[in-house]
Amino acid sequence: MANAPKFAGKESREKWGWWYANRFLFWRRLSQLSILAMFLSGPYFGVWILKGNYSGSLLLDTIPLSDPLITAESLAARHLPDALTLIGAAIIVLFYAVLGSKVFCGWVCPLNVVTDCAAWLRRKLGIRQTAKISRGLRYGILVLILLGSSVSGMLLWEWVNPVAALGRAFVFGFGATGWLLLVIFLFDLLIAEHGWCGHLCPIGAAYGVIGAKSLIRIKVIDRAKCDNCMDCYNVCPEAQVLRSPLHGKKDESLLVLSKDCISCGRCIDVCAEKVFKFSTRFDHSGE
């Protein structure tokens, strides 16, 4: 029997305890806050672990890390990035291409905390209506950004990039960034469920393409154990990725292979029947 969205995870907490039902959420928040702290430790305490912001940085003043989308924009705009930027982009692309689908979105992006809060409040308030927006729109926006940069010769996305703006806001003050975050929060809360991350964000679209063949995947252990409580669907920011592995035909894979999965592990947390686990794309046991 399907549970109400506002009670998602309750059965898991009652059966296995709070830690089991929230462990991946806890580790994700710790990861996001730790990375943010590494950026802020320099400006606030003079300890430069990550120098820069989410668009581009230096780890320990040695290892370059560059946002692949910004790098692609630069190339499209015919502004050849320096060697350090290209190396940094290559490191990021290789890391996420191997590690897991959209791991940046679920484990690094600070904006994920804002959109997750909107999704949680939406469930608690029982808001069910949502605007019908194609999930493919984000890929269209990604293409338009690159085309726009090519035509204009400018890095158009950096004018409005809320992820980079949020990182800078903790140092320079929120100002207009605070209003931008409020708009995204209210959009997700009142207009479209998972509207920003699930339908519009071109950064997530870029990481989806990068991690399309990545190693780490969510796997359904045993479809027969599913009791159709719908808790996993209610908490998943990309619920469509669960349909085939969980309720697909017998010959369909038990792995969540969609590039839209953000590898957050919330489906594992909230499932009282322990239907899901983290595995690799090469795990075909049970099929």
Swiss-Prot record:
Cofactor note: Binds 2 [4Fe-4S] cluster.
Positions annotated to bind [4Fe-4S] cluster 1: 226, 229, 232, 236
Alphabetical UniProt keywords: 4Fe-4S, Cell inner membrane, Cell membrane, Electron transport, Iron, Iron-sulfur, Membrane, Metal-binding, Repeat, Transmembrane, Transmembrane helix, Transport
Periplasmic side stretches: 51-79, 161-170
Gene3D superfamilies on file: 3.30.70.20
Domain 4Fe-4S ferredoxin-type: 217-247, 252-281
Cytoplasmic side: 1-29, 101-139, 192-287
Primary location recorded for the protein, binned into one broad class: membrane
Needed cofactors: [4Fe-4S] cluster
Matches recorded under NCBIfam families: napH, PRK09477.1
Subunit structure: Interacts with NapC.
Name assigned to this protein: Ferredoxin-type protein NapH
Naturally occurring in which organism (per UniProt): Haemophilus influenzae (strain ATCC 51907 / DSM 11121 / KW20 / Rd)
